[in-house]
Amino acid sequence: MKNLIKFGVVAIFSSAMSLQSAEFESNVALSSDYIWRGMTQTAEEPAISGGFDIAGESGLYFGTWASNVEFGDGAALELDWYAGYANELENGVSYDFGYLAYTYPGEDSLDFEEIYLGLGYSYFGYTFSSGQDDAPDNS
């Protein structure tokens, strides 16, 4: 069921976005440790990560991001994908909402999903996320 929902979200976003007006971006990083929400994801070892994004003039976007991980349970890769909509109003207020899936190939029990809403103005911003399929406690 999850894969069907993911496919539907990507299909909707990709059909609504003209490839001629789309902006493609990529990124890569080498870090001394991958820390997420205050916890190491690589057992305090180096991480290599990278991703690809596509965004349309309409504000629709989707992308993917990956990194090595080390939890001691067989998971070696985190593969995230996301889709959303972002815009800035004439008064300078910006907003962003979307869906984010964290997946761990070979360790499906670690997979989880979030929806998020971000609001910003000038140099200030706030993002609220809510888990849709919460990850297990990794303390």
PLM features: what roles do these ranges have?
Residues 2-8, 18-139:
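Outer-membrane beta-barrel proteins
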Residues 11-15:
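Repetitive helical segments and hydrophobic/amphipathic motifs
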